[in-house]
């Protein structure tokens, strides 16, 4: 088997996206209301606005029930906002699309397909030639460390391995933005740390724009370039924080004084910070 480099096959082939002045993601005055069984109106999100530039790893952090996942699902086009607009690459989101990749907290692999076939699924549906599909699948199998398990089915994989496949499958489709809804939330603490390290490494290679949802402050700082701190009922952005810690990163940074300071600041934002805006 030939050696595998950290260079994406698309970059080698010259398909790298040109830098764009417009934000990769723009959320503009988005609100989301639900009708309760009693007939009352519940406001899940209230006039949320923010932007994520190209190649940024952005994190939504907040308590349960603050609308983090709801906002991600709106961005994915799986739900519609009550008001406001969301744009990806300058195009308004009006439903699901190949320009957005999604990794869920739950395990979403097709159980009748192997690891290789799961990663290949979207490429095959788009009619990509077999040779090109093979190159891309091989690259991502190596990126997530699952080449030896390429012909296994999901029932033969651990939870962490299944989430590795989900990440590879999403990235293989080369979306404009990767949406991640607490993808490590169901994993044990040790596996979660391993997955965070893997995601850091994969992101350094792909530089894909990411919107990542978590309630874990450590995870938000470890992974993110920018953190949007949310408050609940209704869901709003309380604070926007840039992470002043250089990349590449590793788990040793949790002892860095800047990391500890940010963790303390975000903790106070979540519990007794300023009013939402």
Annotate each language-model stretch with its function.
Residues 113-121:
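Short coil-to-helix segment of the ABC ATPase nucleotide-binding domain corresponding to the Q-loop/switch region
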Residues 120, 124, 131-149, 201:
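Conserved ABC ATPase "signature" region
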Residues 152-155, 173:
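Conserved signature/switch motifs of ABC ATPase nucleotide-binding domains
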Residues 167:
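Hydrophobic anchor residue at the start of the ABC signature
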Residues 1-33, 275-277:
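ABC-family P-loop ATPase nucleotide-binding domain
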Residues 76:
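Helix-to-loop junction immediately C-terminal to a conserved catalytic motif
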Residues 61-63:
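The feature captures the beta-strand-to-loop junction immediately N-terminal to the Walker
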Residues 84-96:
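Conserved ABC transporter NBD signature motif
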């Amino acid at each position: 088997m030939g050696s595998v480099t950290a260079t994406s096959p698309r970059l080698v082939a010259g398909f790298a996206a040109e830098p764009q002045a417009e934000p990769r993601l723009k959320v503009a005055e988005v609100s989301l209301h639900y009708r309760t069984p009693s007939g009352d109106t519940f406001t899940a999100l209230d006039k949320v606005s923010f932007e994520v530039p190209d190649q940024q790893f952005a994190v939504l952090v907040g308590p349960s029930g603050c609308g983090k996942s709801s906002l991600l699902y709106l961005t994915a086009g799986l739900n519609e906002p009550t008001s406001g607009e969301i744009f990806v690459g300058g195009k308004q989101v009006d439903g699901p699309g190949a320009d957005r990749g999604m990794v869920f907290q739950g395990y979403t692999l097709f159980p009748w397909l192997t690891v290789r076939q799961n990663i290949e699924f979207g490429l095959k549906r788009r009619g990509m030639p077999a040779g090109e599909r093979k190159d891309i699948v091989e690259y991502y199998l190596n990126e997530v460390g699952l080449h030896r398990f390429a012909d296994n089915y999901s029932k033969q994989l651990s939870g962490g391995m299944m989430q590795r496949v989900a990440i590879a499958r999403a990235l293989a489709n080369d979306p404009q933005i990767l949406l991640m809804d607490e993808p490590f939330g169901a994993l044990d603490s040790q596996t979660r740390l391993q997955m965070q390290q893997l995601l850091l490494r994969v992101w350094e290679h792909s530089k894909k724009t990411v919107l990542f949802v978590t309630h874990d402050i450590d995870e938000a700082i470890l992974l993110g370039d920018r953190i949007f701190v949310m408050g609940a009922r209704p869901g709003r952005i309380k604070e926007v924080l840039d992470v002043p810690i250089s990349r590449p990163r590793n788990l040793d940074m949790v002892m860095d004084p800047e990391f500890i300071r940010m963790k303390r600041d975000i903790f106070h934002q979540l519990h007794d910070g300023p009013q939402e805006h």
